[in-house]
Amino acid sequence: MICPPGENKSMAERKQGGQGNGVGSSVVTEVKPKTQKPSLYRVLILNDDYTPMEFVVYVLERFFNKSREDATRIMLHVHQNGVGVCGVYTYEVAETKVAQVIDSARRHQHPLQCTMEKD
């Protein structure tokens, strides 16, 4: 089979209905690796009897970008229920936020506890 310029044999064979000896008629499909979304983790603040409520609101605004209203709502939930969710993040981000909260609490001499758990 003579191929027109710019076409290879398999292109010419396909134009003729794929009639050929089978050489050069394989189909290449691109295989994309399946990626999974990363696991998410809830960052939790735990209630205690010593950390001022205003400091908890500050932490929620500063490290979790909460509005004053949302921070106050979460702080009251923590106060009434003993624990509250600050946000849901990938592992590394959650780990960093927990460390930031604990570090800030220690610098301000508050016993505030923060932890994370798989969502």
UniProtKB/Swiss-Prot annotation:
GO BP annotations listed: protein catabolic process; proteolysis
Cleaved signal peptide residues: none
InterPro entries per record: ClpS, ClpS_core, Ribosomal_bL12_C/ClpS-like
Recorded coiled-coil stretches: none
Ranges for region Disordered: 1-29
Family: Belongs to the ClpS family.
Subunit field text: Binds to the N-terminal domain of the chaperone ClpA.
NCBIfam families from the UniProt entry: PRK00033.1-2, PRK00033.1-5
Role, per record: Involved in the modulation of the specificity of the ClpAP-mediated ATP-dependent protein degradation.
The protein, known as: ATP-dependent Clp protease adapter protein ClpS
Organism expressing this protein natively: Caulobacter vibrioides (strain ATCC 19089 / CIP 103742 / CB 15)
Lineage: Bacteria, Pseudomonadati, Pseudomonadota, Alphaproteobacteria, Caulobacterales
